[in-house]
A protein has these predicted regions:
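AMP-binding/adenylate-forming catalytic core of the ANL superfamily
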Residues: 167, 173, 196-293
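Conserved C-terminal "lid"/linker of ANL adenylate-forming enzymes
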Residues: 240-248, 282-334
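Active-site-proximal glycine-rich helix-loop-beta segment
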Residues: 8, 195, 317
Length: 334
């Protein structure tokens, strides 16, 4: 708050969740030049508006598969999206969760002024980032000024390890919880982020996933469910997903996108049970054609209710990964 005010900026906060009905009129009124959002917002725009349009017919799908045509279509769509955001946007900062690869590729090819920031509440918060003119697909950028980053417990084969940080903005510790504080700091005082990552030769950070979410495959492979979920969520009929391990197999819990179902299947509500299994198989085949061998899913299980999420729109994974994926349950949103 203090910094933008000191620069003469006007700051606008939404007092309700940023649904399309809330966000669109606000953008038209405010016409922001700088905007900070969680990935879910831009992912929904990409899936429901951009991708849905370019996969709506055989003609569009054929064009979209051609590299130079896809880039051209993304550029045209990006100009329209800029108008939706008010036409004055210079910086769209995205953070709080991992951005879907398809959505980021669209932003990059559309030449949209976006950048991804990486940080935690405990580091107040920025650790790495880049300017919109410098972004690289899949990377959060180099360490921010005044921040040092390194990897701990690096796997010699993958070159990946836990990201640890040293910065003046890091917290001193958790309030009246010395045990938790001790766990998140190395012996030489660096903060353990709990995230797995790797660096390029010139120091750009690529985040692979949460250490606690990583699944160890049958032959010792490191499987990152977030990467599989990114592919799952790029399917036009998938709204959200969680990948979990069950009895040595990877199972995908999927909440389907009802708008996409309506567009793809006439009268889908009346005939859902008859074609649901075919759709599940379609999703399995779609994912397994795009991931490596040990990240292939064996099954899709429908999650009829929306996933329970945090205020920053992250799925509360622990509610789903610790139970039998076939278990019927009722969960209220929190």
């Amino acid at each position: 708050m203090i910094y933008p005010f000191s620069m003469g900026a006007r700051v606008v906060y939404l007092d309700r969740p940023p649904t399309a009905s809330v966000l669109m009129p606000t953008l038209a009124e405010v016409r922001p030049s700088v905007m900070l959002i969680v990935p879910l917002i831009i992912e929904k725009i990409y899936r429901h508006q951009i991708l849905a349009k370019f996969t709506s017919s055989g003609f569009w799908r054929a064009l979209y598969k051609i590299d130079f045509m896809r880039r051209y279509l993304h550029r045209v769509a990006g100009k329209k999206l800029m108008k939706v955001f008010g036409g004055r946007l210079r910086f769209l900062g995205i953070g709080g969760a991992k951005l879907d690869g398809g959505a980021e590729k669209f932003l990059l090819e559309a030449r949209f002024p976006y950048a991804i920031g990486y940080g935690l509440t405990e580091t107040a918060p920025l650790l790495a980032g880049a300017a919109p003119s410098q972004v690289r697909l899949g990377s959060t950028g180099p360490a921010a000024p005044g921040v040092e980053l390194r990897l701990e417990n690096v796997n010699p084969e993958t070159r990946q390890g836990e990201i640890v940080a040293k910065t003046p903005s890091a917290m001193i510790g958790y309030y009246k919880n010395p045990d938790a504080t001790k766990e998140v700091f190395t012996e030489d005082g660096w903060f353990r982020t709990g995230d797995l990552g790797e660096f390029s030769a010139d120091g750009w950070l690529y985040i692979k996933g949460r250490l606690k979410n990583m699944i160890v495959g049958p032959s010792g492979e490191n499987i990152y469910p977030e990467d599989i979920e990114s592919v799952l969520n790029s399917h036009v009929c998938v709204a959200d997903s969680v990948v979990t391990e069950h009895e040595g197999r990877l199972v995908a819990l999927v909440h389907f996108n009802t708008d996409a179902l309506e567009a793809k299947f006439d009268g889908w509500k009346e005939d859902f049970e008859n074609w649901k299994e075919n759709l599940k198989k379609e999703v399995v085949d779609y994912v397994n054609s795009k991931v490596n061998r040990f990240s292939r899913i064996s099954e899709v299980v429908e999650e009829k209710q929306e996933f329970v999420k945090t205020p920053t729109q992250k799925i509360r994974r622990f509610l789903y990964t610790k139970r039998n994926p076939h278990q019927k349950h009722e969960m209220s949103k929190r």
